[in-house]
């Protein structure tokens, strides 16, 4: 049975996921198609056991049928979570519990650029992504945002 309250820890586009026994961090596999759910967000106790300190943010209640789950959003106080999974991988791996997939989906920003910087040659300022899921791709300057 999935825990009623879980913790959504995100750092630079990476998320902490655990297996059904609370062991982690675990990675997602994009496009995985299985009938078994193996991965989920950790509980408060599991985050504490992993020795991760974090700053609490907002809470989100998600309803699935007659069940309500509380997702506690927070920012981990760590450097780079190298072994955590990429946020972008979570939504396409159905071994991830629907609570985690829905929480990630709701956290995705639909941004519209209001400003584009052009030079005298009418060229647009672009930035090449240096790390992360979109490493090597070009886009408008920016980065991951929390809300």
Where are these regions (language model features)?
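Conserved N-terminal beta-strand and adjoining loop/helix that marks the start
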Residues: 1-17, 101-124, 141
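Acidic, metal-coordinating catalytic segment for phosphate/diphosphate chemistry
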Residues: 1-4, 65-114
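Hydrophobic transmembrane signal anchors and adjacent membrane-proximal interface regions, especially
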Residues: 9, 37-39, 49, 62, ...
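Conserved Nudix-box catalytic region and its N-terminal flanking loop in Nudix hydrolases
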Residues: 11-50, 123-147
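A residue-identity detector for tryptophan
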Residues: 38, 54, 80, 84-86, ...
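Alpha-helix initiation/capping motif
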Residues: 41-44, 97, 117
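Mid-chain, well-packed structural core segment of small domains
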Residues: 49-73
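Beta-hairpin (beta-strand-turn-beta-strand) motif
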Residues: 74-75, 120, 129
